[in-house]
Amino acid sequence: SILAAMAILGLVDTLIPLLAERFGLWQFHATRSALVLAALLAGAAALGWRLRPRRWRGVAARSVMIAAAMTVYFACLASFSIAQAVAGLFSAPVWVVLVTALVLRRRVGAVAWAAAAAGFAGVLMSLGFLGGGAEVSAAALLPMAAGLFYGVGQIGTREWCAGEGPMTLLFGFFLVIGVVACAGLALVSLLPEAVRLEAPAQAGFVLRGWQAPDATFAAVVAAQAAGSLVGVGLIVRGYQLAEASFVSVFEYTLLLFASLWAWALFGQGVTAAQGAGIALILASAALAARFGTAQRPAPAA
């Protein structure tokens, strides 16, 4: 079920560039959040899902971190290849180790440091900083910002949200990112039209306001909403059926599935350096899981 979840999430994330030229990031997040929140409320009414958190502050803080991560991640999908965006997101375990050791002042074993270093090298290779050959700008580090926020959110899941159910966390995340998206729409509407029109194509995805939806927008957003719900459900089921340290490794196959979907749908390949980077990230995840130091990456919502 984990592999099926990663295949679904990889597919729906690959569709984002279809929206980037005509629609905006904030419109996408606001619409998707509305659909998912409606589905969660319907599920709570029909199936008894618990959406109310036991610890409001913890769930709110965690939701803010994950919302920040997903805002940066989806913005990157319009400017970077899918492999680069996902690799940046999966720098989260590196940040988890650093924050745990340097901020929380907790002991981190040598294997965890080695796995984090290998994963970090893999991310840098995927982003073109190692072995790419071509000149790379500092902007290529942006996907790693998503990983930083995601890593803090992972720590928050464990430290602040113990005992909270997956539907509660999902509801909190989509509620927060929906509010952020509405605020984003309001802010970009205040920008002079000349600024929005003269922005580069990639920046336009972030600066663009509300546009009249069409069939493509509706299809992509519906697929994203359904994919988020089904993907999370399959992941939860996978963790119920097998040992967490074993299952967590398979979540990193999102890198493979996203790259395969990008190649199949848009002919977007990966370089040799990016392929080696992806392999190194997967190897670091397996190493961490083998010695009980894995940090579950959690689904890209």
Go through each PLM region and give its residues.
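Transmembrane alpha-helical segments that form core, pore/gating elements
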Residues: 17, 40, 133-196, 211, ...
